[in-house]
């Protein structure tokens, strides 16, 4: 009897987690005063996820999503690590394909790598501002573990600087 209940409990928890993760990626409207932003990259594992976490941390009036033209399976662990250094947790983010967002309306669609800019699909919804902010891919860095981690930090800091400036401009336009 205990095994049966345990099995049933585990099945229910698995279903709950599956539904919760699907709901977490579901686009919502930003409302009258919110700014709805989509950040795109190739795999949606490093740059776009760091930008997503940073931009969302600046204020509650920005609704942020991220996607990839070829989304990978999970967020890069080094990206998660360097974001934790800033007390931003992106460990529960799930890479998504940009196709999930093509019919949505967006205030901003931002590409953070050249490949995403070149292969960005046509959005069927209204896109008010399309911006490209290209960054090197820190996952391509080679060398010692510390050197690679420092590359992730450098890209994180570059994204932070540029996206905070963009956030301030967004606030002025509201």
Explain the meaning of each model-derived region.
Residues 1-9:
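Bacterial N-terminal signal peptides that target proteins for export
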Residues 24-100:
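Conserved active-site segments centered on acidic
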Residues 27-29, 120-174:
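Phosphate-binding/catalytic loops
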Residues 45, 114-117:
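Short glycine-rich anion-binding loops that position phosphate/pyrophosphate groups of nucleotides
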Residues 8-19:
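Bacterial N-terminal signal peptides
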Residues 103-105:
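Alpha-helix C-terminal capping/helix-to-coil transition sites in glycosyltransferase folds
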Residues 49-51, 76, 119-122, 142:
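Short glycine-/acidic-enriched loop or helix-start segments at secondary-structure transitions
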């Amino acid at each position: 009897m205990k095994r049966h209940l345990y099995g049933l409990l585990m099945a229910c928890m698995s279903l709950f987690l599956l539904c919760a993760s699907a709901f977490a990626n579901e686009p919502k409207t930003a409302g009258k005063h919110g700014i709805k932003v989509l950040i795109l990259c190739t795999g949606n594992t490093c740059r776009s996820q760091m930008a997503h976490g940073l931009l969302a941390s600046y204020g509650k009036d920005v609704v942020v999503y991220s996607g990839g033209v070829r989304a990978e399976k999970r967020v890069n662990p080094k990206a998660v690590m360097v974001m934790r250094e800033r007390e931003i947790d992106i460990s529960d983010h799930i890479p998504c394909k940009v196709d999930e967002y093509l019919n949505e309306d967006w205030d901003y669609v931002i590409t953070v790598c050249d490949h995403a800019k070149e292969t960005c699909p046509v959005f069927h919804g209204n896109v008010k501002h399309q911006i490209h902010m290209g960054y090197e891919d820190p996952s391509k860095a080679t060398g010692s573990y510390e050197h690679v981690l420092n590359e992730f930090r450098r890209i994180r800091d570059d994204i932070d600087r540029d996206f905070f400036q963009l956030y301030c401009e967004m606030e002025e336009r509201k």
